[in-house]
């Protein structure tokens, strides 16, 4: 009986339609991040405390809520949807990191981190925070979780200021997270 219920809830979690607006916005962010020639951000002598706080603490809030809210509301379909979107985001992010590592566009290697290193694009931190916030806003309520929205640019800016990613990489990461939400999440029925 448990297997049938598991399979039934999994099948129910697959969306029957997707958000065309969210899909278009996410694809636009991905293309912008890959093809726009953003300037290299100079190395910062000091990083504002707000970005350290975001990097080490605040960016986890949406991710925790994206799992806690479906559990609290006993929303099995929502739990499957956030799991599906998270797995898809992780796979897409890491596959894209490896695929774009040696690609050069506008005289800039997409995989090169600001001050050395590989696998720059897309930013995994940006993709996961984008996924979590977009999931909560799409599945439950745009208005109810609007307060989480500032954590997205704060996380992106923290990654840039800490010299971990380029501007294009964080935009592409956000697009990847939103893309997976648009494909795997549907609004909760009242």
From Swiss-Prot:
* GO function term, MF aspect, one: phosphatase activity
Known EC number: 3.1.-.-
Keyword annotations from UniProtKB, A to Z: Antibiotic resistance, Cell inner membrane, Cell membrane, Hydrolase, Lipid A biosynthesis, Lipid biosynthesis, Lipid metabolism, Lipopolysaccharide biosynthesis, Membrane, Transmembrane, Transmembrane helix
The record's free-text note on cofactor binding: Does not require divalent cations.
Q: Is Hydrolase among the key words of this record? A: yes
Observed effect of gene inactivation: Lipid A retains the 1-phosphate group; none of the lipid A species have the usual phosphoethanolamine residue at the 1-position as the enzyme responsible (EptA) cannot act on a phosphorylated residue. In strain 26695 95% is hexaacylated (16 to 18 carbons in length) with both 1- and 4'-phosphate groups, 5% is tetraacylated with only 1-phosphate. In 4 other strains (Cp20-84, Hp7-91, Hsp110-93 and J99) only the 1-phosphate tetraacylated species is seen.
- GO biological process entries: lipid A biosynthetic process; lipopolysaccharide biosynthetic process; response to antibiotic
Provide GO CC annotations from the record: plasma membrane
Tree of life domain: Bacteria
Which spans are transmembrane here?
22-42, 60-80, 117-137, 145-162, 164-184
The annotated topology with respect to the bilayer is: Multi-pass membrane protein
Question: Across the pH scale, how does activity change?
Answer: Optimum pH is 6.0, activity is seen from pH 5.5 to 8.0.
Part of which pathway?
Bacterial outer membrane biogenesis; LPS lipid A biosynthesis
Localization (cell): Cell inner membrane
Q: What class of enzyme is it?
A: hydrolase
Q: What else does the entry mention about this protein?
A: In this organism most lipid A is tetraacylated without a phosphate group at the 4'-position and a phosphoethanolamine residue at the 1-position.
Which family is annotated? Answer: Belongs to the lipid A LpxE 1-phosphatase family.
Q: What does this protein do?
A: Removes the 1-phosphate group from tetra- and probably hexaacylated lipid A species, has no requirement for the Kdo moiety of lipid A. Has no 4'-phosphatase activity. Has no activity on phospholipids (phosphatidylglycerol, phosphatidylethanolamine or cardiolipin). This enzyme has to act before EptA can attach phosphoethanolamine to the 1-position of lipid A.
Q: What is this protein called?
A: Lipid A 1-phosphatase
What is the source species? Helicobacter pylori (strain ATCC 700392 / 26695) (Campylobacter pylori)
